[in-house]
Amino acid sequence: MLSFNKFRPQGVVANLFNQTRPTLIAPDTFISTRSYSIFQKTLDDPLRTSPTCFAGKTVLVTGANTGLGFEAALKSFGLHAKHVILGVRDVEKGEQAKQRILQTMPQIPLSLSETTRDGNPTSQRISVRKLDMSDYDSIHNFVNELAAKDGPLDVAILNAGVFGVKYEPLSKYGWENDLQVNVLSTALLSLLLLHAKAIKPKTGVLEFVASRRMRTVRLTEEEKNAPSLLEVFNRKQEKFDASRQYQVSKLLLVAFYKSLATRSANLVQGSPIITAVCPGFCQSNLSRGHQGFAADVLRAVLNTFVLRRTEEGARTLVTGTIPEEERHGRFWYDDELHDVMLPDNVGDTQQFANKILQDVITAIQCDTSVPVV
């Protein structure tokens, strides 16, 4: 039987990888079997669109003015959400994103049978809120405003993240940028949302956007035995490995999430569903720091032949928010639900996760108040 996928550009590349696989993933080469399988899955399987409807629901998306966050916000609006909140660092860019959503879907009603509810015009169904993930005060203010103005959320998609090209000057709190935004600030935001009861219990969903490639991280014995992995990867490296730093930040985030999900009942009575998703290899603006002709050419090739479209990657962010109890503490990717699997060499995974959670909370407490789990 002919496979339609073979006639897609991605399918052609997949077939080429099938033919050359023994060479590409031979022992001691830079492409691991696990990396290959993730890459192959991205090439072969388009993701399904969301089977859910957000009618009557309030949805928060952070990092929502561009990339995956924008597409997730657009989809939420298109699924008839009562209220979509865009959490953005730059309010002006957030307002521009809001206008793009309204222009793209000007006639989307609140539900399949009505065009307004409570007399609210369509434009009032999207709010833009300032959220600077490098500033703890901004995160506190953001959550306080949510709790005061919006009532409990039905869905919170914690998408905001960075991928540093080089070792950035330390944040105001003394942390490398990937660690600050992807780990510490995201952790603080999640804890404050839970503590403020800003997400509906039991049926609400708190979603972390992660990366399953964090499983490819191989910690050295020195790193594993260090008092704090945060401190280890906060040091200025002689040769900064941007890709490894990003994956380490996602490893720490997933470890934090894994521990948080097991303890969430201690934080608020009737916890929301806490889950994590991975959109796979897809086009986004995370690589915007890579500049120059070579970077532009590589980006064009990857975008054309390899990566999922941003819209397709955002489908995972939306389908991951289906409020099912079995999603709590698990990992959604490629339209399937998986157990959270950390790298093989971290030892006892729950013990590792619990230690990371405590390290993260300790680091945040040096600079701001944070709920204790």
Predicted segments with their positions:
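Alpha-helical membrane-targeting segments
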Residues: 1-41, 236-243, 281-312
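Rossmann-fold NAD(P)H-dependent dehydrogenase/reductase core
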Residues: 30-285, 370-371
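An acidic site on a long C-lobe helix of protein kinase domains
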Residues: 135, 252, 309-312, 352, ...
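Short, hydrophobic alpha-helical segments
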Residues: 197, 321-325, 364, 368
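Short aromatic-enriched loop/helix-cap "lid" or pocket-rim segments at secondary-structure transitions
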Residues: 218-222, 286-291, 342-346
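Non-transmembrane alpha-helical segments in soluble domains
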Residues: 257-261, 318, 357, 361
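C-terminal helical subdomain
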Residues: 300-342, 350-352
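C-terminal helix/juxtamembrane-tail motif
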Residues: 355-373
